[in-house]
Amino acid sequence: MHGQSPLIRTARGLRTVKTRPSSCRQCRTIQISAAPTTETPRIGGDAFGLPANTSVHDVADARFEVLGSPYSMLSVTLSPSQKLYTRRGTLVGVAGQADNAQSTLSILSPFSRAFLGIPFLYQRISSSTPLTALISTKSPTTTFSILHLDGTTDYMVAQRNALLAWTGHTLLLSPRVSRGLSLAHWGSTHLSGRGLAALSSPGQIYQLTLGDGEEFVAHPSHVVAYSVSRNPPLPFRLKSSSFRLQIPSVTGLFPETKFFKTMRDTDTYKAIGRFLFSLRTSMRRTIWGDRLFLQFRGPTTLLMSSRGVRVADVLTNQEVNEISDAQAGVVPKAVELSSQPKAVEAASTEQAPSAIHIASVAKDGKVSFEDAKDLKEFVR
C-alpha cells in the first residue's frame, strides 16, 4: 500500500483549521450600498409591498425596473388608466397595444420651475390597456435609481435634472426654496405622498444610511436626493488653514476724497466692479469649489452619485459667495439665532415738560401773561 500523498495530508490539515470569530469593538452604523435599481413586487405582494389579500383598490398600478448597468434603460409597466409622467424626449419605445395609448405634453408650473432651473416639460402617457414603456436618457454615462414612496417618508431631490419619471395618484411634486437654507433647497423638488419615482444621475448611484446622532459631510454635486427628517442639511465649508489671519482694509489707509466718491458713481467703475465680482465667483467655483459641502445629521437616507455634476447646477452665484465669505463654524450659530425670537425693545417715550402760565387782569381791563418758574411760586 502506498502512503498518502503529502498534498492530500496538507489539504486535510487545512480543513481542520477553524477560524475564530473576530469581535467588532468599534462598529459603525453608517451603511453604504448600491441603490436598488429595480422595484419588483415581493412574493405574494405588489410593487408597494402589500400582501396578496388586499382589496382591488389598493393594488399597485405600476412597476419600475431598471435594465442593464451602467448604460441602463427604465422599463415601466402600467395598468389601465394609470398615468406616467416622463421628461420630454426620453421615451424610447412602447410594448403592448399602442393604438390604445395616449401621449400628451404636460407643462408643470412653468414660471416657478423655470425660475429655479427645473425642467417643466413632461410627457404624460396613459392607456386603456396594460402597457410597457421604455425610457432612457441622452447621456451615455447615466444610471437610474428607483424611489419607493409609501406615504410615511418624504424625499428631497437635490439635483435639478435628477427627476426623470414618476407615477402615482397621490404623489405630489413641488419646487422648494428656503430662504434660511437656500443652499440645500435651491432648485430642489419635494416628493410627498405615495408612488414611484425614477431618478437619473451620472455614474453609479449609492445609498447611504445614517444612524441617529451620526454626521456626514458630502459635496453638493454628488447628492442626488435625501429623505426629509427633523435635521435639515446645513452648509459646511472646510478650513483652508488652522491660523486665522486678518487682512487690513487698504481703503481705510487713504483719506476719503471727493474724487473717489465721484468715481464710485460712474458707470465705468460699476462695470469694472461687476467684472471683478464675476471673476471672483468663477474662481471660487473652479479653484476653491472643493471646499463647499453639505453637512447631514442622522437619522436620514442619502442617494449619492459616483460622478458629480457641475457646481453651477446645484449652487447659484449668490450661494457660492455667501458660503465662501462666511467663516467656518458660524452657520450653526446663525441657524440657532434665527430660530430664537427676537426681543422687542420697548421704546421709551419722553414726556414733554409741563409749564404753568399765569394770567392777571388789572383794574383798567388789561391782561398780562407770565410764566411761573416753579409750582411753589404759583401757590404763593
From Swiss-Prot:
Cellular compartment(s): Mitochondrion
Source superkingdom: Eukaryota
Keywords: Mitochondrion, Transit peptide
Main location: mitochondrion
GO biological process: inner mitochondrial membrane organization
InterPro entries documented for this protein: AIM24, AIM24_sf, Trp_RNA-bd_attenuator-like_dom
Transmembrane segment boundaries: none
An annotated GO cellular component: mitochondrial inner membrane
Keyword Lipoprotein among record annotations: no
NAD found in the keyword field: no
The organelle targeting sequence, given as a residue range: 1-37
Family, as annotated: Belongs to the AIM24 family.
Name under which the protein is recorded: Altered inheritance of mitochondria protein 24, mitochondrial
Source lineage: Eukaryota, Fungi, Dikarya, Ascomycota, Pezizomycotina
